[in-house]
């Protein structure tokens, strides 16, 4: 009898976990590949932007060269996350923080890749939490600067939850620099420009809350088992 009730408990827990998920979440995450170098035509236009959903990924690929290319001909960058003003002026000094550093152009293992997951919650004190309906901004500065003012910048719009359709599958979909050139979803007038600050304090330790129905069922079944 106890064995049957334990199986029932496990079944109910699994059922509640499945059906208590956010309806806007996706079974498959999209990955957006961005090649961070000055020869990328989308950076040259100055309006490079992508639209993502919560739980999607941004994969940034650093410049990479053959060994025959001299050091002074390679590109190196420090990438920053900034606010809207920093994005507009391409200035990370006023309001921004360092995200990644592309400093190994001759890496023997291929180009350096950095990934950003657009998640609502992060367990890391220096991680970043993203919100649907808001814009986020990345810029870079060259290493060394040498007085050059070339500005590479990227704008990311996190779509509202209701515009992210559920997807069924088992593999991530990958979009490279030539995919999704036309972006049909432009931010609405009420789009919020998110301030570039890493999550700290209370927000850094947040995790999705357990649904109250699930907690009540677990407590009820636990009480039943204790009375046996």
Curated annotation (Swiss-Prot):
Which residue ranges traverse the bilayer? none
Similarity annotation: Belongs to the ephrin family.
Which Cys pairs does UniProt list as disulfide-bonded? 62-102, 90-151
Spell out the residue ranges making up region: Disordered.
186-205
Disulfide bond among keywords: yes
GO BP term (any one): cellular response to follicle-stimulating hormone stimulus
Compositionally biased, Basic and acidic residues: which spans? 190-200
Gene that encodes it: EFNA5
Identification of the protein by name:
Ephrin-A5
Which species? Answer: Homo sapiens
What GO cellular component is one of the record's annotations?
Answer: basement membrane
């Amino acid at each position: 009898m106890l064995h049957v009730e334990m199986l029932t408990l496990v079944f109910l827990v699994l059922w509640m976990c499945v059906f208590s998920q956010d309806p806007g979440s996706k079974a498959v995450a999209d990955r957006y590949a961005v090649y961070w170098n000055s020869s990328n035509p989308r950076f040259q236009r100055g309006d490079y932007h992508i639209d993502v959903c919560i739980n999607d990924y941004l994969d940034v690929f650093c410049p990479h060269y053959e060994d025959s290319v001299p050091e002074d001909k390679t590109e190196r960058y420090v990438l920053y996350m900034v606010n809207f003003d920093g994005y507009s002026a391409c200035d990370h000094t006023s309001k921004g923080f360092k995200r990644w550093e592309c400093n190994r152009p001759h890496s023997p293992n291929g180009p350096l890749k950095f990934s950003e997951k657009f998640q609502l919650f992060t367990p890391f004190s220096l991680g970043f939490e993203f919100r649907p309906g808001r814009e986020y901004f990345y810029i870079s500065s060259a290493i060394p600067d040498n007085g050059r003012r070339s500005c590479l910048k990227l704008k990311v719009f996190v779509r509202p939850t209701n515009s992210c359709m559920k997807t069924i599958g088992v593999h991530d979909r990958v979009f490279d620099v030539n995919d999704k050139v036309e972006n049909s979803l432009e931010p609405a007038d009420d789009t919020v420009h998110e301030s570039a600050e890493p999550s700290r304090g209370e927000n850094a330790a947040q995790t999705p809350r357990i649904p109250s129905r699930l907690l009540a069922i677990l407590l009820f079944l636990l009480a039943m088992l204790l009375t046996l």
